[in-house]
């Protein structure tokens, strides 16, 4: 069983549609308190902090059947980088509209940090109890936006969707109509690269 260290409905939906058994557990990590040297460093650090926070919570649980079934934890964090500036979720309508007016007909990069903790197999065939295995990587996908009118921008912002997503857009939602194309992993833009997770799960289970 996989633990998703996130309350993100988008990430939960990705795993559910892919048929990956999992449970969600909120990490409680304060995302505003992190120092970072780059966007890549930020999402890498935050994804690992989220996974380790859930790891600590699991260690406090009694060794019941549920906790014994858990063999891996994944933490993720995403930001959108546009013209060298890091965009998280827009704080208000004015900021969301301003961003969209800047992004119209241009492109940026959605970065998602992935931190996968797992219980490696020991020589006796049992699994390590403390999630000492770690695989982590930042995946980047370029997103190109359509040439949008002011009316299209304000209409999209009025749906409320931009306030739920890094960068202020949801590829899996209404924002899809405002995107011309992507270069890279589709699910990474939604918040979790499924091809990357498949490789991590394969390594953890071997």
Regions flagged by a language model, labelled:
Residues 23-31:
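A short beta-strand-loop structural module common to alpha/beta enzyme folds
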Residues 3, 38-206:
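Anionic-ligand binding patches
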Residues 10, 30-32, 122:
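Surface-exposed, flexible loop/turn segments at secondary-structure boundaries
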Residues 7, 27, 119:
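Cofactor-binding loop segments of dinucleotide-utilizing enzymes, especially the Rossmann-like FAD-
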Residues 1-20:
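N-terminal beta1-alpha1 ligand-phosphate binding loop
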Residues 20-22, 71:
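A structural micro-motif
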Residues 12, 22-23, 114, 136:
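Histidine (H) residue identity feature
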């Amino acid at each position: 069983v996989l633990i998703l260290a996130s309350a993100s409905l988008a990430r939960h939906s990705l795993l559910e549609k892919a048929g990956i058994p999992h449970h969600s557990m909120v990490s409680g990590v304060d995302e505003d308190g992190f120092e970072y040297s780059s966007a890549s460093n930020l999402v890498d650090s935050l994804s690992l902090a989220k996974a380790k926070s859930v790891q600590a919570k699991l260690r406090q649980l009694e060794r019941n059947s549920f906790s014994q079934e858990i063999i891996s934890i994944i933490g993720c964090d995403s930001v959108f980088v546009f013209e060298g500036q890091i965009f998280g979720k827009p704080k208000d309508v004015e900021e969301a509209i301003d961003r969209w007016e800047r992004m119209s007909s241009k492109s940026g990069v959605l970065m998602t940090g992935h931190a996968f903790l797992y219980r490696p197999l020991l020589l006796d065939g049992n699994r390590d109890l403390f999630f000492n295995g770690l695989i982590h990587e930042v995946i980047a996908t370029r997103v190109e936006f359509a040439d949008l009118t002011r009316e299209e921008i304000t209409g999209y912002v009025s749906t409320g969707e931009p306030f739920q997503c890094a960068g202020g857009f949801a590829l899996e939602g209404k924002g899809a109509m405002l995107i011309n194309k992507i270069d890279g992993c589709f699910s990474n833009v939604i918040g979790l690269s499924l091809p990357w997770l498949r490789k991590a799960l394969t390594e953890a289970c071997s």
